[in-house]
């Protein structure tokens, strides 16, 4: 898995013909954050920020996942979404 493949996938996901389902978007978001930042390094958003909490929780579930594993899962998911939604 190369950084270039990961960056290409990050650009391609922005060009999908249809917006992926919320669960798919959470997968993409959380794996991108784990690959680029690592483990969660912020406080969990407040109780009124439902979207923020969902994103934080999805990212936090990946705690301990290596950058390489997160990048691979991200690229694989983007490839799946490209087949499903088109680009």
Swiss-Prot record:
GO MF annotations in UniProt: identical protein binding; long-chain fatty acyl-CoA binding
Q: What does this protein do?
A: Binds medium- and long-chain acyl-CoA esters with very high affinity and may function as an intracellular carrier of acyl-CoA esters. It is also able to displace diazepam from the benzodiazepine (BZD) recognition site located on the GABA type A receptor. It is therefore possible that this protein also acts as a neuropeptide to modulate the action of the GABA receptor.
Q: Which UniProt keywords apply?
A: Acetylation, Endoplasmic reticulum, Golgi apparatus, Hydroxylation, Lipid-binding, Phosphoprotein, Transport
- Which Pfam families would you find in this protein's record? ACBP (PF00887)
Q: What is this protein called?
A: Acyl-CoA-binding protein
**PROSITE patterns, alphabetized:** ACB_1, ACB_2
Q: Which GO terms describe its biological process?
A: fatty acid metabolic process; phosphatidylcholine acyl-chain remodeling; positive regulation of phospholipid transport
Residue numbers carrying N-acetylserine: 2
Does the UniProt entry include the keyword Endoplasmic reticulum? yes
Q: Which organism is it from?
A: Oryctolagus cuniculus
Could you tell me which residues carry N6-(2-hydroxyisobutyryl)lysine?
Answer: 55
Compartments annotated for it: namely: Endoplasmic reticulum; Golgi apparatus
Q: How does it assemble?
A: Monomer.
N6-succinyllysine occurs at: 8, 17, 55, 77
Gene name as annotated: DBI
Residues modified to N6-acetyllysine: 8, 19, 51, 55, 77
Which cellular components does GO assign to this protein? Answer: endoplasmic reticulum; Golgi apparatus; mitochondrion; protein-lipid complex
Q: Which SUPFAM superfamilies match?
A: Acyl-CoA binding protein
Keyword Transcription regulation listed: no
